[in-house]
Amino acid sequence: MAGVWSDEKKLACWLEVELAALDAWAELGVVPAEAVGAIRAAARPPSPERVAELEATVQHDTAAFVDAIAGELGPEGRWFHYGLTSSDVVDTGLALQVQQAGQLLLGGIGRAQGAVTARAVEHKDTLCIGRTHGVHAEPTTFGLKLAGWAFELERGRERLTRALEGMRVGKLSGAVGTYAASDPELERIACERLGLEPEPVSTQVVPRDRHAELLSTLALVAASIERFALEIRHLARTEVAEAAEPFGRGQKGSSAMPHKRNPVVAERLCGLARVVRANAVVGLEDVALWHERDISHSSAERVVIPDSFLALDYMLDRFAWIVEGLEVRAERMRRNLEAGHGLFFSQRVLLALVDTGLERDAAYRLVQSHALRAHEEEQDFPDLVRADAEIAGRIDLDPVFDLGWYTRHVDTIFERLAALTRREEPVHA
């Protein structure tokens, strides 16, 4: 990923755009084919150092790039950058970089999805307590948590694919988008050679709503990774201790406390998500430019677009690493579930009473009285319910307190995950 966003790669993409434009001019009979052939044979991407040296004088990076190459081409150099404006080269070159970087991110999402899916299947039946508002709710399985992550990553993959398609455009329409010095056919031919579509209506630049959508999509994928990492952090707390990220031999968790085993990588992912999210705001700020363009977006984009790709690429790699090596403590999950004194059975008792004809609020208050007592006195909720003659006289409590009731549809949910993995039928993620 760093290579895609290097200065060397940027200049190589700019040259690729220039050469595609020259090929198109030759095909249209505007620039001699012999001159284009000579330019192709001689032109090489200039070094970033050479461009910087020239830019110190001309104060324009694209002009410095053009001068660095044209100055080495001899008489044919007059055709280099023919009919183009800087943004023709910069925006179209950026589209090439984005497509390459996007494919790397899609690969990273695929690896993360694979890791999550494998661990989800492994822990399909690993029982744990579900928590809402941070408080014990009802039983679920650890595999179901991960299955949800797999589908969220799939939605991220689909969004990124769409955003990349939205960025698969180039423009060679000149200073204000009117083709005054170029030709729509030039743009069509050159973009086709580059694997891009012409921007339907451009100004001096490609409209920045495309870039904002891309950055927002990267931020949304980062937010998903943050959500997953935050869950791992919560499960790693001493009071919970249901999961832990990998901890290597010789690793130290603290400079002062030898006992510490902190979820530092998960914390790092949460921090980087904030950076990617903030960058999306910059992308939105860049949409509104003066008239046919100003250059206020340029300095910001040179930071936020590469940084967002680099950060998310790292986040996906480290998240997959965490999941692949995640220590899952099934016995601790069971103990934490049992520590709730069976309070999670409250809805089962409530509905069973309603089924007997008892008015819902009366049933709710009756069950709640036992739940509060179990909580305050640390007594077993099922025992208190069984001791209530009114409840015991109305319903058969054995099936009500069947733990397997909560996981009876797990196989059905995992069939959806299997379908997603097979890609044999459409699944709405």
Model segments located where?
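A helix-coil-helix interface module used to build multimeric assemblies
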Residues: 1-173, 179, 184-189, 198, ...
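Long, amphipathic alpha-helical stalk/connector segments used for oligomerization, subunit docking
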Residues: 275-358, 366
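C-terminal hydrophobic structural anchor segments
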Residues: 342-393
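A conserved active-site cap/scaffold subdomain adjacent to cofactor or substrate pockets
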Residues: 207-310
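Active-site-adjacent "gating/activation" loops or surface patches in catalytic cores
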Residues: 187-204, 208
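Glycine-rich cofactor-pocket loops
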Residues: 121-143, 243-254, 259-260, 291-300, ...
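Residue-level signal for inorganic ion chemistry
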Residues: 29, 269, 312, 363
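Conserved hydrophobic residue
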Residues: 31, 36, 240-241, 359
